[in-house]
A protein has these predicted regions:
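Bacterial N-terminal signal peptides
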Residues: 5-15
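A periodicity- and composition-biased signal for non-globular, repetitive helical segments
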Residues: 8, 127-128
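A phosphate-binding catalytic loop at a beta-strand-loop-alpha-helix junction
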Residues: 113-124
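Cys-dependent protein tyrosine phosphatase-like superfamily
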Residues: 18-113, 128-171
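Sequence-pattern detector for short linear motifs
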Residues: 5, 124-125
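Basic, ligand-binding patches in group-transfer machinery
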Residues: 2
């Protein structure tokens, strides 16, 4: 019995350690497709893991003052990753920031890309816009995927995304 308990404990420790040593341990991590993955704030060691997974660019939607952004940028560049910071205020995203996001994500040289903010709520809103305007999703389908990305409990971001789509969608 003691042997079984010990083995179970070791298995649990292995599972916890293994999960912390993968990109899956990034908050709200989602491998959307072979070109994009999304998530919340990565740790610096996650950047190395993302590079090993084939990521070529990091797109950070946080403010420079949020969670050691300068260290993240330096680490990304040290690893040879392209690094883009679009400083989106959580409560006040701007159309120009979405325009820049779309330009960056449209460039195939910036793919595969990992797109993040703190909890992936801003990412969800910007991703929803991209899915409708670039990938031909319906607003409803894009919204469902954006919720999986992290756009939850943020009605102002959802409203912003819908208004941006309405203004820019070809009739």
């Amino acid at each position: 019995m003691k042997l079984i308990s010990t083995l179970l404990a070791l298995f649990f420790v292995f599972q916890v350690t293994q999960s912390q040593d993968s990109v899956q341990s990034i908050r709200n991590y989602l491998h959307v497709n072979d070109q994009f993955c999304t998530g919340g704030q990565p740790r610096l060691e996650h950047l190395e893991m993302l590079k090993k997974e084939g990521v070529k660019a990091i797109i950070n939607l946080r403010q420079p003052s949020e969670h050691r952004a300068a260290e993240e940028e330096a680490k990304a560049k040290e690893l040879g990753l392209r690094y883009f910071n679009i400083p989106v205020v959580f409560t006040d995203p701007k159309d120009e920031q979405v325009d820049e996001f779309l330009r960056i994500t449209d460039d195939v040289n910036n793919r595969p890309a990992f797109i993040h903010c703190t909890a992936a709520k801003r990412v969800g809103a910007f991703w929803m816009i991209r899915r409708v305007l670039r990938d031909g999703f319906t607003v409803e389908a894009a919204e469902k995927e954006a919720e999986r990305v992290g756009l939850v409990e943020s009605p102002h971001l959802n409203e912003f995304a819908r208004k941006y789509i309405e203004k820019h969608q070809k009739k």
